[in-house]
Curated annotation (Swiss-Prot):
Origin superkingdom: Bacteria
Keyword NAD: no
PROSITE patterns: GREAB_1, GREAB_2
HAMAP family on file: GreA_GreB
GO biological process, one term: regulation of DNA-templated transcription elongation
UniProt entry keywords in alphabetical sequence: DNA-binding, Transcription, Transcription regulation
Family of the protein in this entry: Belongs to the GreA/GreB family.
Keyword DNA-binding assigned: yes
Gene symbol of the encoding locus: greA
Name of this protein: Transcription elongation factor GreA
Amino acid sequence: MAQEKVFPMTEEGKLKLEEELEYLKTVKRKEVVERIKIARSFGDLSENSEYDSAKEEQAFVEGRITTLDNMIRNAKIIEDEGNSNIVSLGKTVTFVELPDGEEESYTIVGSAEADPFEGKISNDSPIAKSLLGKQVDDKVTVQTPGGEMFVQIVKIS
């Protein structure tokens, strides 16, 4: 039997996934079923774009429910390792890009809760991979799709 994939995440990230799952199961699923009922009332299903659209949305919602359920069931909560001097999963790292000194901060999380717009990057991302295990004042070369970037870590929290 194949081993299930483990999804490292923070407690906060797991809670957000649980909230989304609950919403999909209790609200969105019912809305989609109602849309399907209404679309069926329009008659001929072979040329009924409302019905097709509602069925596509239903497939998406059910797929997302399955995905979220799997991620939550196989979640591994990131424990605080106690050492705030080393970049690790769950830590927020602030660095300056060299030589211009532009400061950036990211929290390194598991891929299930990554959201770059909220400053949360996946531990599988090029930036995170380069920073993991490093310490304050370390200078790091980061390989990105746009080329190399040189940074210096200024804070870990």
